[in-house]
UniProtKB/Swiss-Prot annotation:
Residues 224-276 are annotated as: Disordered. It comes from Geobacillus stearothermophilus (Bacillus stearothermophilus). It comes from the Bacteria. GO terms for cellular component: large ribosomal subunit. This is Large ribosomal subunit protein uL2. The gene is rplB. One of the primary rRNA binding proteins. Required for association of the 30S and 50S subunits to form the 70S ribosome, for tRNA binding and peptide bond formation. It has been suggested to have peptidyltransferase activity; this is somewhat controversial. Makes several contacts with the 16S rRNA in the 70S ribosome. The keyword Disulfide bond does not apply. It holds the Pfam family Ribosomal_L2. Keywords: Ribonucleoprotein, Ribosomal protein, RNA-binding, rRNA-binding. One of its GO terms (molecular function) is rRNA binding.
Length: 276
């Protein structure tokens, strides 16, 4: 999809960009694959804020996505490419030969009318899902499982992809979108191709109101708070932090401080850490 720019007719329009949605083929989602989505506004079951800067925004319905891709041996045809308000990637509606309909994350260059397949014997073709051990070295993949049968958890955002680098015993070596190189069980499934909507990262929201439509609330600087609310707070006027390093609102060091557990069980699967 192309990026659409606006003339600076107002301060809010100046610099604002939007996607032209030229790849989207319908604005009517499949009703059987919709579920209600209640707003949590970043609160947990006690009503406490566990994720800051969330709340409000346009009402949404959840699209039920097939992350498992476990419909083996049954061909499916792409019926539509649709917008999904709950993720950065677009989604594709697949009509299978047995009459079932499912949504999948739409890979780059997937078009209406194309046929896709899942299973160990599927061809190496965009949109096909198969175990990593059956995918040739050098292939770009997305929607990767970490545990067989659990469903894809890695590489699902718009424009992302991972690359199969090699095979070692029952494990496959994959370079993820972050630059991390890790081993994943060969039985875990992945989908061939890159995730579509790669222009998403170039969109400039442009104004605060548009962020609120998306359910994003303001981010307040710690230095303008009171000491009771933030370690950077207090003082007269524009006071310095007054600490050795910047802190999170909960008093932990930030900006470069490592928060990963020292003895994480998954360390043995990571060959190279992600790029900083």
């Amino acid at each position: 999809m192309a990026i659409k720019k606006y003339k600076p007719t107002s301060n809010g329009r100046r610099g604002m960009t939007v996607l032209d949605f030229s790849e989207i083929t319908t604005d009517q989602p499949e009703k059987s694959l919709l579920a209600p989505l209640k707003k949590r506004a970043g609160r947990n079951n006690q009503g406490k804020i566990t994720v800051r800067h969330q709340g409000g925004g346009h009402k949404r319905q959840y699209r039920i996505i097939d992350f498992k891709r476990d419909k083996d041996g049954i061909p499916g045809r792409v019926a539509t490419i649709e917008y999904d308000p709950n993720r950065s990637a677009n989604i594709a509606l697949i009509n299978y030969a047995d009459g079932e309909k499912r949504y999948i994350i739409a890979p780059k260059n997937l078009k209406v009318g194309m046929e896709i397949m899942s299973g160990p014997d599927a061809d190496i073709k965009i949109g096909n899902a198969l175990p990593l051990e059956n995918i040739p070295v050098g292939t770009l993949v997305h929607n990767i499982e970490l545990k067989p049968g659990r469903g894809g958890q890695l590489v699902r955002a718009a424009g992302t992809s991972a690359q199969v680098l090699g095979k070692e015993g029952k494990y496959v070596i994959v370079r993820l979108a972050s630059g991390e190189v890790r081993m994943i069980l060969g039985k875990c499934r992945a989908t061939v191709g890159e995730v579509g909507n790669e222009q998403h990262e170039l969109v400039n929201i442009g104004k605060a109101g548009r962020a609120r439509w998306l359910g994003i609330r303001p981010t307040v600087r710690g230095s303008v708070m009171n000491p009771v609310d933030h370690p950077h707070g207090g003082g007269e006027g524009k006071a310095p932090i007054g600490r050795k390093s910047p802190m999170t609102p909960w008093g932990k060091p930030t900006l470069g401080y490592k928060t990963r557990k020292k003895k994480n069980k998954s360390d043995k699967f990571i060959i190279r850490r992600r790029k900083k």
